Structures are given as C-alpha cells and as structure tokens.
Curated annotation (Swiss-Prot):
Annotated keywords: Calcium, Cell membrane, Copper, Cytoplasm, Cytoskeleton, Immunity, Inflammatory response, Innate immunity, Membrane, Metal-binding, Repeat, Secreted, Zinc
Subunit structure: Homodimer. Homooligomer (tetramer or hexamer) in the presence of calcium, zinc and copper ions. Interacts with AGER and both calcium and zinc are essential for the interaction. Interacts with CACYBP in a calcium-dependent manner.
Official protein name in the record: Protein S100-A12
Record InterPro entries: EF-hand-dom_pair (IPR011992), EF_Hand_1_Ca_BS (IPR018247), EF_hand_dom (IPR002048), S100/CaBP7/8-like_CS (IPR001751), S100_Ca-bd_sub (IPR013787)
One Gene Ontology term, aspect cellular component: cytoskeleton
Mode of membrane association: Peripheral membrane protein
Organism, as annotated: Oryctolagus cuniculus
Annotated positions binding Ca(2+) 1: S19, H24, T27, E32
Amino acid sequence: MTKLEDHLEGIINIFHQYSVRTGHYDTLSKCELKKLITTELVNTIKNTKDQATVDRIFRDLDEDGDHQVDFKEFLSLLASVLVTAHENIHKE
C-alpha cells in the first residue's frame, strides 16, 4: 500500500471509529462529530469545545438535512481543512 493509500484508509478508519457509537453505524450524529472534532482535529479547527462552533459545522455539513453526517458530507469538512492547511503551508 502506498503512503497516500495508507492515509486514505486511515481517514476511513477514523470516521468509522466515531460513527459506530450511536445511531446508524455509517453516519455521525452531532455528538459523534463533536467527539471526532475535539479529539482528532483539536489543533486544526479553532473553538472545537464551543458548542456553537460544533452546531455551525454540523449544520453546514448536513447537506441533506437528515441530522446525520455521512462519509461524503464528512469529506467536505476534510477538504476544507486540507485547503486551509495547504494555504497556510505556502504562507510560511
């Protein structure tokens, strides 16, 4: 497995680590998303402990309005985080 493929598998595994806790096994509830963000992205997303921030992120990600974040919706968050990280690397 290449380094990139290994990282992709890691993203899937982390998503599943949090998605299986409550409700549907392949989606994130707001509580599961908060736990994932505050644990895995604590140094990347500001104000992760602020409930209003989590509420806004969840609302923005939940494109279909089903009160769950599926893997495709979760990837929107990762894409945004990666774009910001990429821009910050070029600023340094």
